[in-house]
Amino acid sequence: SEKIASHTERLHLVVKTAGILKDESVGVRPEKKLADLTRSKLEKVFSVNCFGPFLWYAALGHLIRHREALVVATLSARIASVGDNRLGGWHSYRASKTAQNMLTKNLSLELSRTNPRAVIVGLHPGTVDTGLSKPFQKGVPSNKLFSPEQSAAYLWDVLNTLTPERTGQVIAWDGQTIIP
């Protein structure tokens, strides 16, 4: 944050894209059953998907605490929706993204108290044809498997239509609100 602060006094758009679903080098992969969970794997996934983004936002401090237009977006996932969970599994990923969504909501409430123009959201990019989703693309219809460029374009469109009324929400690539 110090390096960023040396270049600007305020940020108006922050998009945090770091995330982990699997990392074979440390044995992290989506769990099919609760017995597959370990503390170290759970901590690794939470560290990247939840703790990292929000500790970074906290470190940004005054750069995002102003009264000008502000959008802070963190990549989330539809799979984090408690109300939409019909399959179970993927415990650490789902839980970390659900916790991320709660922190998104909390940050939105905190910043809106002093900046009614702040919009803090989670963004669901859809299923993107990357190494992260490769092993899990089997049942995805071809029109719902996006190239990284296509997903980025959809999310850019969403970012450009956000209003303060959407703050605290998780929004899909097509602009639809995802139920918590």
Task: List PLM regions with ranges.
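Short-chain dehydrogenase/reductase
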Residues: 1, 57, 104, 152-155
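Conserved Rossmann-fold cofactor-binding substructure of NAD(P)-dependent oxidoreductases
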Residues: 1-10
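Conserved hydrophobic beta-strands of the Rossmann-like cofactor-binding core
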Residues: 10, 14-15, 19
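Hydrophobic structural elements of the Rossmann-like NAD(P)H-binding subdomain
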Residues: 15, 73, 120-123, 133
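Catalytic loop of short-chain dehydrogenase/reductase
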Residues: 20-25, 30-50, 55, 65-114, ...
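C-terminal helical subdomain
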Residues: 122, 130, 134-180
